[in-house]
């Protein structure tokens, strides 16, 4: 049976809506009383796994799920061995460098060498600062990253930004955008090559039905 890994959190509702448009219904995951992490759709065509967003590519890479929906930010951070098929056009956000608004810096290039940068996206932050040839100390934080500069533990942060409201409320401003992120459709490479569970059909249908979402978002 086809298995689809779905991300908990902000992408879940749109992911389920998209899958419903191709005949796969996992809306039971949206029921506030639901405690199941694995369910079958009513047609018994596929099963869904409800997992943390960071774990979606892990389940797909190891073949426990043939399909997955996950943010581009997760793919950039984890660099999993999966096949990427489509930009699904929802879940828009951006990975940015931010500093306190009273900071003298107005570009990441202006940050002092060996300064401290807090982030839960350690690899993305490291790659960015390596690219601009600025040595920094990356401090891994997995809660409220904004507290890094507020408490003086770091001069800057690298984090996902959607509306910018959280940054503003905490006295931070964006300096640079590393990349834009949206939801992506991924697949297990071998399953795709073998067309297991009619995988090519589902990839084509999901990709095709995502186009109206992408057009609406733009």
UniProtKB/Swiss-Prot annotation:
Database matches in CDD domains: PBP2_HisGs
GO molecular function: ATP binding; ATP phosphoribosyltransferase activity
Record bears the keyword Cell membrane: no
One GO cellular component term noted in the UniProt record for this chain: cytoplasm
Documented EC number(s): 2.4.2.17
Gene3D superfamilies: Periplasmic binding protein-like II (3.40.190.10)
Keywords: Amino-acid biosynthesis, ATP-binding, Cytoplasm, Glycosyltransferase, Histidine biosynthesis, Nucleotide-binding, Transferase
Compartments where located: Cytoplasm
Keyword Methyltransferase appears in the UniProt entry: no
Pathway(s) it belongs to: Amino-acid biosynthesis; L-histidine biosynthesis; L-histidine from 5-phospho-alpha-D-ribose 1-diphosphate: step 1/9
Principal subcellular localisation of the protein: cytoplasm
Reaction equation(s) it catalyzes: 1-(5-phospho-beta-D-ribosyl)-ATP + diphosphate = 5-phospho-alpha-D-ribose 1-diphosphate + ATP
Gene Ontology biological process: L-histidine biosynthetic process
Family membership noted in the UniProt record: Belongs to the ATP phosphoribosyltransferase family. Short subfamily.
Record's function text: Catalyzes the condensation of ATP and 5-phosphoribose 1-diphosphate to form N'-(5'-phosphoribosyl)-ATP (PR-ATP). Has a crucial role in the pathway because the rate of histidine biosynthesis seems to be controlled primarily by regulation of HisG enzymatic activity.
Notes on the domains: Lacks the C-terminal regulatory region which is replaced by HisZ.
Subunit and interaction comment: Heteromultimer composed of HisG and HisZ subunits.
PANTHER family in alphabetical order: ATP PHOSPHORIBOSYLTRANSFERASE, ATP PHOSPHORIBOSYLTRANSFERASE ATP-PRTASE
Record NCBIfam families: hisG
Protein name: ATP phosphoribosyltransferase
Gene source species: Acaryochloris marina (strain MBIC 11017)
Gene name linked to the record: hisG
């Amino acid at each position: 049976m086809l298995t689809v890994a779905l991300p908990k959190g902000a992408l879940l509702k749109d992911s389920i809506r998209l899958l419903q448009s191709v005949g796969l219904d996992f809306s039971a995951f949206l029921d506030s009383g639901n405690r199941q992490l694995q369910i079958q759709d009513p047609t018994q065509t596929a099963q869904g796994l409800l997992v943390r967003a960071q774990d979606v590519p892990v389940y797909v890479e190891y073949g426990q799920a043939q399909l997955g929906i996950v943010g581009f930010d997760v793919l950039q951070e984890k660099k999993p061995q999966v096949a990427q098929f489509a930009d699904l056009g929802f879940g828009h956000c951006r990975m940015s460098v931010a500093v306190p608004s009273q900071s003298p810096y107005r570009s990441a290039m202006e940050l002092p060498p060996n300064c401290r940068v807090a982030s839960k996206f350690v690899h993305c932050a490291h790659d960015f600062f390596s690219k601009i040839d600025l040595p920094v100390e990356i401090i891994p934080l997995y809660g409220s990253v904004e507290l890094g500069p507020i408490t003086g533990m770091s001069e800057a942060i690298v984090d996902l930004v959607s509306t910018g409201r959280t940054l503003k409320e905490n006295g931070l401003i964006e300096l640079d955008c590393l990349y834009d992120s949206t939801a992506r459709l991924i697949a297990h490479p071998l399953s795709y090559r073998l067309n297991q569970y009619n995988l090519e059909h589902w990839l084509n249908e999901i990709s095709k039905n995502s186009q109206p979402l992408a057009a609406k978002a733009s």
